Amino acid sequence: MVAALLGGGGEARGGTVPGAWLCLMALLQLLGSAPRGSGLAHGRRLICWQALLQCQGEPECSYAYNQYAEACAPVLAQHGGGDAPGAAAAAFPASAASFSSRWRCPSHCISALIQLNHTRRGPALEDCDCAQDENCKSTKRAIEPCLPRTSGGGAGGPGAGGVMGCTEARRRCDRDSRCNLALSRYLTYCGKVFNGLRCTDECRTVIEDMLAMPKAALLNDCVCDGLERPICESVKENMARLCFGAELGNGPGSSGSDGGLDDYYDEDYDDEQRTGGAGGEQPLDDDDGVPHPPRPGSGAAASGGRGDLPYGPGRRSSGGGGRLAPRGAWTPLASILLLLLGPLF
C-alpha cells in the first residue's frame, strides 16, 4: 500500500511535476543541508524520498508507481486545487472516516495502489517518514481514503469514531456462529441483489434480521477495503438502491461518490454502450428471458437517448422505479465465490 508518494500526481493533467523529479529535487536539497553522519532514516523508517528512490530502482515497483501516478492523478488534481497536488492538505479533513461518507476513490486508483503494494519496495512507501516535506505530508492525507483498510480506523475502533474495514468486519462475523449463519442465508437469498436485478422479500427479511445482530450490523457500517473492494461497493450500492430505495453516498457503510471521478474514467465506455445499445434489440424479461415489446416510457427517448441496454444483453433493473442497473454488475456466483474467498487474501 502506498500513502507517501511525494507529489503523487505523477503525470497528472495540467502539467504537474512528476513525482520522481520531485523526489530527486528533495534528495539534492536534503543532501546539501543534512549534517555529516546523519542517517537517511528515522530509526527504522525510511525517509519517503529514499523509499521512492528504492522503488524506482526496482523495475516492478517503478512500473507500478507509474501506473499509480496515472490512475490516481485525478484524485490529487480534484482535491488538491487543480494542478497543485501539494495543496491537497487544505482540502482534506484529518479524518478519512468523515470524508468517506461523501467521496469514493476511483477503482482504477485503488487497483493501482494494490498492485504497487504487491511489489517488493512498494509497501515501504506507506510506512516512510515525510520528515519536514509538507508536499509529502499533504499527499499522504490526499491518498489515504484510497488505501485498503482491514481494521478499525483508529485504536478506539468504530465506537471511538473510527471506521472499520469490511474485511475485518467479515472476519468477526465468521467467528460468530449466529452471524455466520445469517451471512450464509444472505448469500443464499440475495443473489439477485448481487447482480443488480431486484431485492426479494426474502432477501429484505434476511437483511433486517442481520441489522439486529451487533456483529452482522458491522457489515452494514463498514467501509469496503482490500482486494474485493470494488465488488463490495457494488453489492452495497445495489442493496441500498434495490432493498431500501436509498441513494449511495449518505450512509456510513459506503465510500460515497458524487460521480465526478468515476465519470472521468467511464466516458469512453459510455460512448461504446450508446453505440451498441442503439439497435433494435428487444429487452428480455428478468425472469423468463423471453423478448417482450418495449415497456411504456422506456427506450432511448425516456432515458435521454441512451437506449434500453445499460450494461448487458437486455438486462435492466426491475427495482427502483425503472432506473438503470449499475454497469459491470457481477453475477451472483462470482460475487459469492469472491466474498467467500475474501478472508483468504
Curated annotation (Swiss-Prot):
Glycans are attached at residue 117. Residues 254-328 are annotated as: Disordered. Residues 319-345 form a propeptide. This is Growth arrest-specific protein 1. Residues 260-271 have a biased composition (Acidic residues). Coiled coil: none annotated. Keywords: Cell cycle, Cell membrane, Glycoprotein, GPI-anchor, Growth arrest, Lipoprotein, Membrane, Signal. It is found in: Cell membrane. Specific growth arrest protein involved in growth suppression. Blocks entry to S phase. Prevents cycling of normal and transformed cells. Binds 20(S)-hydroxycholesterol (20(S)-OHC). It comes from Homo sapiens. One of its GO terms (biological process) is regulation of ER to Golgi vesicle-mediated transport. A lipid is attached at residue 318 (GPI-anchor amidated serine). GO terms for molecular function: oxysterol binding. Residues 1-39 form the signal peptide. InterPro entries: GAS1, GDNF/GAS1. GO terms for cellular component: membrane; plasma membrane; side of membrane. It comes from the Eukaryota. It holds the Pfam family GDNF. It is a lipid-anchor; GPI-anchor.
